[in-house]
Amino acid sequence: MASRFPRFSQGLSQDPTTRRIWFGIATAHDFESHDNITEERLYQKIFASHFGQLAIIFLWTSGNLFHVAWQGNFEAWIQDPLHVRPIAHAIWDPHFGQPAIEAFTRGGASGPVNIAYPGVYQWWYTIGLRTNQDLYTGALSLLILSAIFLIAGWLHLQPKWKPSVSWFKNAESRLNHHLSGLFGVSSLAWTGHLVHVAIPESRGEHVRWDNLLTALPHPQGLGPFFAGQWSVYAQNADSSSHLFGTSQGAGTAILTFLGGFHPQTQSLWLTDIAHHHLAIAVVFIIAGHMYRTNFGIGHSMKEILEAHTPPGGRLGRGHKGLYDTINNSLHFQLGLALASLGVITSLVAQHMYSLPAYAFIAQDFTTQAALYTHHQYIAGFIMTGAFAHGAIFLIRDYNPEQNEGNVLARMLEHKEAIISHLSWASLFLGFHTLGLYVHNDVMLAFGTPEKQILIEPVSAQWIQSAHGKALYGFDVLLSSANSPAFNAGQSIWLPGWLDTINNNSNSLFLTIGPGDFLVHHAIALGLHTTTLILVKGALDARGSKLMPDKKEFGYSFPCDGPGRGGTCDISAWDAFYSAVFWMLNTIGWVTLYWHWKHITLWQGNVAQFNESSTYLMGWLRDYLWLNPSQLINGYNPFGMNSLSVWAWMFLFGHLVWAIGFMFLISWRGYWQELIETLAWAHERTPLANLVRWKDKPVALSIVQARLVGLAHFSVGYIFTYAAFLIASTSGKFG
């Protein structure tokens, strides 16, 4: 008999259809639970899937390059980056009537097109690409790379090429290679590209394969390098009147420390960026020689961890036992990787707008808003995933004997203190912040705005002043002309930095006031509550006073039946599920705040944010009600415009979001009754009753319905906000 889906679990494949399909999909990637899995096969499958993942990423980026080269307007955009709208790709839609064709034909195109808001035009322009031919070459190269990775993935599943478990668990070698090779050498290679291709291109010199070996990136070549006169490479930098992409005002320096932004492009100096990558390369290549491998020199990670016993014995046995615990748990390693990647992704969001690296991207407001929002949402999902896998580690991989008395065991031992402190912080933040907003709201409603409680964020303003922002008059560190710090940096990066930080037209160290103070604490409430739910879910995943044997039930279970009342809703999966709602709402506040503050900055009316953000009706009326006007105007009595697609997506996003509640609020019994009624009708309907089922149709389980509800809530939430963000920004700024 041909085995049915899922082939990896004979038990599941014999189950009734609903359970078989749902649990089959849910456990498809849970290799640990598959039939006949061994530790060796587990590691090899994950290793091979990494090659597939990389192949997909390169295929996707290749597609971006290819479609822009084929249907975009890259060469036209380069001539006037501030006024030509960059095209992502053409739209072919047989339903388009004449009004739609006219509305979507823009950016100098001959037919309907999509405008690009991911910043790839600015990125490609900055790194030295100039023609469609360059884009096609890049697309083809990435396609070939993608194929190589697919072949490598297949190859490493063949008996002769399968790595052993000991190879996967060789942490020191992996660290050395990832630090030196992945980060170090790739940063060095990127420095090379910037110095040999991007910087000459920004000065009007065209360097390609045909002249790469003959075009000197610096007039003195490698002479100063070997003579130890490295400062020569920083001399004669581009002037402040330099026109990007031309020789006008260009210098010859390749590695500088100018600080601040290029006046015309409003982005970091390319020569500063090259210097930064060279420094990263040096640091990481050295770091990749730290750990002991076959050569018997360097640090042993295990020895470092075992030796690290805290002074005074206040922290028990410190890190003893951690090396083997982490090295033998894929979930622990994944949790650490996701936590790091989540933080990095959020930092990318914060830095892409405040310190823009790509030429002219700072003046493309819709792209700035889209990139910030995109990276914050991605960060939220990745961070919640870190806690999910942390909980799975505690359930599946944690061994109490191995970790006796170490920092991990002590986390579990005093979990009540951790959870209650987080709870207290969340309650404090929530009540005080809401109290201030509501008080201010009532004062405005009663016509006495002067009775608002407005708190200046003095600590944050002091920190901004220490970095050189003069506006607040704090006269401290870099904002004080007498400080040693001020004098020390005067000859290198400081003048450029101070000009930039005190220039009110960019997003670096934005001026903050009482509205920022309030929303900052609202966001802090969201962050602490999300963390509380996730930390509690992980720390209670093995067991709690209510359910001491919880780990026997696994990561996700609905309840343990009526015999133990009150065991519903307490699996680690339920904590993850609850936390995602808080995560989404928190990032909602973050992105609303960012967007409103920037809209007023870009329009030159910062007073609107400053005055309206201190009370609830201000947020509702002057941001959430005022800005969707473009969305509800996508179709009007005069026909349609180019925002109509966002208007439709805005409505569709609300629909998907609302469908989520259908699954979240009505539970299993309702659906089971409904299904049985539908089945009854089906069996009595001519023609329809020719189609029969082998097993009884059943409703989704509680956990399955929650997953479907959560998926619709998340997707609808993001679709709605994406449409709102892009339409309200592009509608204002063209």
UniProtKB/Swiss-Prot annotation:
The keyword Protease appears for this protein: no
UniProt KW Repeat keyword: no
GO molecular function, one term: 4 iron, 4 sulfur cluster binding
EC number, as in UniProt: 1.97.1.12
Transmembrane stretches, start-end: 46-69, 135-158, 175-199, 273-291, 330-353, 369-395, 417-439, 517-535, 575-596, 643-665, 707-727
Record-listed phylloquinone binding positions: W671
Free-text cofactor note: P700 is a chlorophyll a/chlorophyll a' dimer, A0 is one or more chlorophyll a, A1 is one or both phylloquinones and FX is a shared 4Fe-4S iron-sulfur center.
GO biological process, one term: photosynthesis
GO cellular component assignments: chloroplast thylakoid membrane; photosystem I
Topology versus the membrane: Multi-pass membrane protein
Keywords: 4Fe-4S, Chlorophyll, Chloroplast, Chromophore, Electron transport, Iron, Iron-sulfur, Magnesium, Membrane, Metal-binding, Oxidoreductase, Photosynthesis, Photosystem I, Plastid, Thylakoid, Transmembrane, Transmembrane helix, Transport
Biological role: PsaA and PsaB bind P700, the primary electron donor of photosystem I (PSI), as well as the electron acceptors A0, A1 and FX. PSI is a plastocyanin-ferredoxin oxidoreductase, converting photonic excitation into a charge separation, which transfers an electron from the donor P700 chlorophyll pair to the spectroscopically characterized acceptors A0, A1, FX, FA and FB in turn. Oxidized P700 is reduced on the lumenal side of the thylakoid membrane by plastocyanin.
Family to which the UniProt record says this protein belongs: Belongs to the PsaA/PsaB family.
Subunit structure: The PsaA/B heterodimer binds the P700 chlorophyll special pair and subsequent electron acceptors. PSI consists of a core antenna complex that captures photons, and an electron transfer chain that converts photonic excitation into a charge separation. The eukaryotic PSI reaction center is composed of at least 11 subunits.
HAMAP family membership: PSI_PsaB
Protein name: Photosystem I P700 chlorophyll a apoprotein A2
